[in-house]
UniProtKB/Swiss-Prot annotation:
It is found in: Mitochondrion inner membrane. It holds the Pfam family NADHdh. The lineage of its organism: Eukaryota, Metazoa, Chordata, Craniata, Vertebrata. This is NADH-ubiquinone oxidoreductase chain 1. Core subunit of the mitochondrial membrane respiratory chain NADH dehydrogenase (Complex I) that is believed to belong to the minimal assembly required for catalysis. Complex I functions in the transfer of electrons from NADH to the respiratory chain. The immediate electron acceptor for the enzyme is believed to be ubiquinone. Its EC number is 7.1.1.2. Its main location: mitochondrion.
Length: 318
């Protein structure tokens, strides 16, 4: 029974990731006035499965001078963390109902740094190492703003439990009152998932392919799956935090469809950003966080702390 539950949890995520890669190629294709994948299956719908078969049947090569254990463990850790992040998310029901669900998600996203660092260091390649160091600095930096934004949202929510956010947003979504936080959160999730215009870790013109340059076949596919699973997970968290994950109805299937549609629209925005914007310079990336986002998020956090205290003398209105 446990194995069946595990499969029912993992397979839909992997299927969503598979079709997200297809949607991305189709969207980018049409934005660049071309068709995208259209050969394998009707309208190219079987392309993700063809890619999966190709990647997982190839021989996984590794550099002769690489550190074998870390080289093998890095992609496994990346995919494991990407799949574990989904456990406390209410969609509208959770797999693991945690009191500190948001802290759990924040700590897991911090752990994903290790898989990138291990892969870059264990490859024994200067390009992979530079890509890994960039990724670590970028991820750790943007986690600061993510943590402060989460703290601000939790001050409004009054709890670290994700399920209570749907109750908080019964009358109106938090994005209406906290839109500056939502905007900074969304840009920070782009940086956290190493997506364009913050894809400095995979700068093809500079670093060949970034931290995974020495990976091929199955291990490379695992990194790929982890990246796209993280993208969908981050957009799901954005939906829960700012867009009210469930409606006021007691119909779970309608709540789930609403949640899925919001997450899909946010994910499509990720692809639109990739097609529209060029890559940032590294110094611009760091300036955006430390000189713009950090002061703003701290100021807003102090505002949300002081507002309830300042208004505590006013009697509640009926």
């Amino acid at each position: 029974m446990f194995t069946l539950n595990l499969l029912l949890y993992i397979i839909p995520i992997l299927l969503a990731v598979a079709f997200l890669t297809l949607i991305e190629r189709k969207v980018l294709g049409y934005m660049q006035f071309r068709k995208g994948p259209n050969i394998v299956g009707p309208y190219g719908l079987l392309q993700p499965f063809a890619d999966a078969v190709k990647l997982f049947t190839k021989e996984p090569l590794r550099p002769l001078t690489s550190s074998i254990l870390m080289f093998i463990l890095a992609p496994i850790l990346a995919l494991s963390i990407a799949l574990t992040i989904w456990t406390p998310l209410p969609m509208p029901n959770t797999l693991l109902d945690l009191n500190l669900g948001l802290l759990f998600i924040l700590s897991l996203s911090g752990l994903s740094v290790y898989s990138i660092l291990w892969s870059g260091w264990a490859s024994n390649s200067k390009y992979a190492l530079i890509g890994a160091l960039r990724a670590v600095a970028q991820t750790i930096s943007y986690e600061v703003s993510l943590a402060i934004i989460l703290l601000s949202v939790m001050l409004i929510n009054g709890s670290f439990t994700l399920k209570t956010l749907s109750t908080t947003q019964e009358n109106w979504w938090l994005i209406t009152t906290t839109w500056p936080l939502a905007m900074m959160w969304y840009i920070s999730t782009l940086a956290e998932t190493n997506r364009a215009p913050f894809d400095l870790t995979e700068g093809e013109s500079e670093l060949v392919s970034g931290f995974n340059v020495e990976y091929a076949a199955g291990p490379f596919a695992m990194f790929f799956l982890a990246e796209y699973a993280n993208i969908i997970a981050m957009n799901a968290i954005t939906t829960i935090l700012f867009l009210g994950s469930s409606l006021t109805t007691n119909l779970n299937h309608i709540d789930t469809i609403s949640f899925m549609l919001k997450t899909l629209l946010l994910t499509m925005a990720f692809l639109w950003v990739r097609a529209s914007y060029p890559r940032f310079r590294y110094d611009q990336l760091m300036h955006l966080l430390w000189k713009n986002f950090l002061p703003l998020t701290l100021a807003l956090c102090l505002w949300y702390i002081s507002l309830p205290i300042a208004l505590s003398c006013i009697p509640p209105q009926m």
